[in-house]
């Protein structure tokens, strides 16, 4: 009986040791299986990075750029069934396992963009700024309008930079001042250019004899000279349009002008004579010569006015000298 109690601790110790070995063996087996599982997962992940994708079954290769997967692979490491993306609306620019293509980018005109390169199955749309717009960022989602310069441009606006404008300075004020002075000086300059030739020609046509020998009585008679004997000479020195313009401005009616024209359709010389005679009859003898000379000068016909004035003045001077000579002869008798 004593021997049994002595052997019992030994038996229990052996059982405990045996159980411990079994547990250790199971733990070791579980650890080994966990390691193998991790190895498998790592292998799968590595294969995924190399182009395998698992959706039901493994596909060995991705769909090429411009295509998408139409269905999953039915056999491990099978080739995928790929179909093209929709041209102009979708694209893929690299190999992939997706069943969808990417949507093409839209170039929003409202944001200052326009299409530079159209979208294809393998390339997205490329946008750029519209004319008179710019974008200075790396990725342009919108473009800004170019600045309009009021005082001049230093650098023109480009696709990537805004316009550089000149600043307003005192030179612009000086320019406006010079322009204003020029506008003020133009009228007197034009007046001198137009009127000075008339004044010079008047001095040239007035000889020394005319300026010194005429007495006050001759000057008075010039304003009351009878133009009837000079009408033909005056008409010959003027064009028909000049005669019409003069008589029209000095009281001859359009009806009378047309009547004289119709009466002398084929003879323009006679038209001029009759028009001047009609004007002279309406005006009368008094101051008719002055009216004629002033009217021609007003119409910028200075040369013609001086020529007619010289002819009449010379004729009056000659008549005066002849009259004086006749009086001297009578006194001698």
UniProtKB/Swiss-Prot annotation:
Q: Where is the Death domain?
A: 228-312
**According to the UniProt topology, which residue ranges lie Extracellular?**
26-173
Q: Which residues carry this modification: Phosphoserine?
A: 223
Instruction: Indicate where the modification Phosphothreonine is found in the sequence.
Output: 213, 320
- Molecular function terms, GO-annotated: calmodulin binding; tumor necrosis factor receptor activity
Show the segment(s) annotated as Interaction with CALM: 228-252
Q: Could you tell me which SMART domains the record lists for this protein?
A: DEATH, TNFR
Q: Where is the lipid attached (S-palmitoyl cysteine)?
A: 198
Its annotated compartments are: Cell membrane; Membrane raft
Q: Where are the TNFR-Cys repeats?
A: 47-83, 84-127, 128-166
This entry carries the following GO cellular component terms, namely:
CD95 death-inducing signaling complex; external side of plasma membrane; membrane raft
Q: Which residues form the signal peptide?
A: 1-25
Keyword annotations for this protein?
Answer: Apoptosis, Calmodulin-binding, Cell membrane, Disulfide bond, Glycoprotein, Lipoprotein, Membrane, Palmitate, Phosphoprotein, Receptor, Repeat, Signal, Transmembrane, Transmembrane helix
Stretches of the chain forming a coiled coil according to its record: none
Q: Transmembrane segments in this chain: where?
A: 174-194
What membrane topology is annotated for this entry? Single-pass type I membrane protein
The record's note on quaternary structure and interaction partners says: Component of the death-induced signaling complex (DISC) composed of cell surface receptor FAS/CD95, adapter protein FADD and the CASP8 protease; recruitment of CASP8 to the complex is required for processing of CASP8 into the p18 and p10 subunits. Interacts directly (via DED domain) with NOL3 (via CARD domain); inhibits death-inducing signaling complex (DISC) assembly by inhibiting the increase in FAS-FADD binding induced by FAS activation. Binds DAXX. Interacts with HIPK3. Part of a complex containing HIPK3 and FADD. Binds RIPK1 and FAIM2. Interacts with BABAM2 and FEM1B.
**Function summary:** Receptor for TNFSF6/FASLG. The adapter molecule FADD recruits caspase CASP8 to the activated receptor. The resulting death-inducing signaling complex (DISC) performs CASP8 proteolytic activation which initiates the subsequent cascade of caspases (aspartate-specific cysteine proteases) mediating apoptosis. FAS-mediated apoptosis may have a role in the induction of peripheral tolerance, in the antigen-stimulated suicide of mature T-cells, or both.
| Record comment regarding domains | Contains a death domain involved in the binding of FADD, and maybe to other cytosolic adapter proteins.
From the Swiss-Prot or TrEMBL record, give the protein name.
Tumor necrosis factor receptor superfamily member 6
UniProt source species: Macaca mulatta (Rhesus macaque)
